[in-house]
Amino acid sequence: MTSLNPTSNGKKVIVGMSGGVDSSVSAYLLMQQGFEVEGLFMKNWEEDDTDEYCAAADDLKDAQAVCDKLGIKMHTVNFAAEYWDNVFEYFLAEYKAGRTPNPDIMCNKEIKFKAFLEFADDILDADYIAMGHYVRRRDNSDGSVEMLRGVDGNKDQSYFLYTLSHEQVARSLFPVGELEKHQVREIAQKLGLITHDKKDSTGICFIGERKFTDFLATYLPAQPGDIETSEGEVIGTHQGLMYHTLGQRKGLGIGGLKNSNEDPWYVVEKDLVRNVLIVAQGGNHPRLMSTGMTVNQLHWVDRTGPANNSTITVKTRYRQRDVGCTLTYDDADNITVMFDEPVAAVTPGQSAVFYDGDICLGGGIIDTLIRG
C-alpha cells in the first residue's frame, strides 16, 4: 500500500514563500488538506538597495500579499551568510577550476532543505516544510519515502533535488508536483492571488537579469586566450574559459570563416593548461560526443543507491531526455556510467541524475568523460 502524501491531522507546515505562483498555490492546497500552514520568506542574497536586477523586495511584497489573502502568518529569515559560504563560494571555486557548476542544486541542498528546515524546526516548531517544486513524494507501507518526477514533464524539477536525503524528503511536501503548471495558474487566478500571472523566475538567483559574463568578471579575473579548431588552427580569441561550457554554440564570435562549411561552431573542450578554447563544427562532432562518464560525490535518496551493473536512465543536464545507461561502482564514492547511445555535451562539474522510471534515485557530479 502506498500513498502520495501523508495525512494532515492538523500538523503544521511551513511553506517556503518565494513570491511566485507555485509557492502561493502550495500554501493554499495544504490549507485545503487540513494542515496548519504558515509562510516563511527567505532572503538569500544581499544586494545593494539600488540594485535594479534583484527583485527580492518585490518578491517579499508579493509573498506577504498572498499570505494576507490566504489568512496565514508569514515569517522572514535571512540566509545570506549561509548562502555565501555554502553556495556562492562553491560556485566561484568550480568556475575557477574550469568546471560548470549548478548553484541551484547546491542551494536546494544547503539552504532550502537544510537551513530552512532547521529554522522551521527550531523556531517555528514545524512538522513538515513545503516548497513549490514540481516533484512528488510517495509514502510506502514500510515507512520509506521516494521522490518521483512531477506530473508536468515540462516543469519536473527532480533533477535539482537529487541531493535531498531520505530524511529531508520525509519532512517535505510538494503539493504542486501533482499538477500541471496551467492548473496551478488557474487555481491562483480563481483565488485572486496577485501571483497568478507572475513570470516564472529564470537564471541564477544572485545574477538576476544581469549579463552573466559581467557578473562573473566582478569576482573572477578574466584571462583571454586563443580559440582553436579541433585541428589546432587558431581562429579567434576568448575572453576567459570560465565564460564557456561544453556544447556552447552562441557567443563565440567566430562565424563565417574562410574555407569552412556553414555548420555552426561548438565548444568541444577547455584546455586549462594552455588556456585554449577548442571548437569544432556540427552538433554531432565526435569531440562533442561521449559514450560514458565517471561520476563522484555520489548521493542516493534511499541511502543505498542502485545495485552494481544496474540498467537505469540518466540525465546529464536539466530538460535533457533520459538516456539508458549501465552503472558500475568503482568504489563507494565513484561510479563509471556507460550510455546506451552517445550523448552530446556531457559537462564536468554538472550533475548526473539517475532514474528508475519516475523514481529519482539520486546522482553525483560528472568528473571525467569517456569517448570512443
From Swiss-Prot:
E.C. designation(s): 2.8.1.13
Q: Which GO terms describe its cellular component?
A: cytoplasm
GO BP, one example?
Answer: tRNA wobble position uridine thiolation
Q: Reaction(s) catalyzed by this protein? A: S-sulfanyl-L-cysteinyl-[protein] + uridine(34) in tRNA + AH2 + ATP = 2-thiouridine(34) in tRNA + L-cysteinyl-[protein] + A + AMP + diphosphate + H(+)
SUPFAM superfamilies the UniProt entry points to: Adenine nucleotide alpha hydrolases-like
Signal peptide, first to last residue:
none
Binding-site residues for ATP, renumbered to this chain = 16-23, 42, 132
Q: Which chain positions carry the site (Interaction with tRNA)? A: 133, 350
Cited InterPro entries: MnmA-like, MnmA-like_C, MnmA-like_central, MnmA-like_central_sf, Rossmann-like_a/b/a_fold
Looking up Pfam families in the UniProt record yields: tRNA_Me_trans, tRNA_Me_trans_C, tRNA_Me_trans_M
**Stretches for region Interaction with tRNA:** 155-157, 317-318
Disulphide bonds in the chain: 107-205
HAMAP family, per this entry?
A: tRNA_thiouridyl_MnmA
Record's protein name: tRNA-specific 2-thiouridylase MnmA
Q: Which organism is it from?
A: Shewanella frigidimarina (strain NCIMB 400)
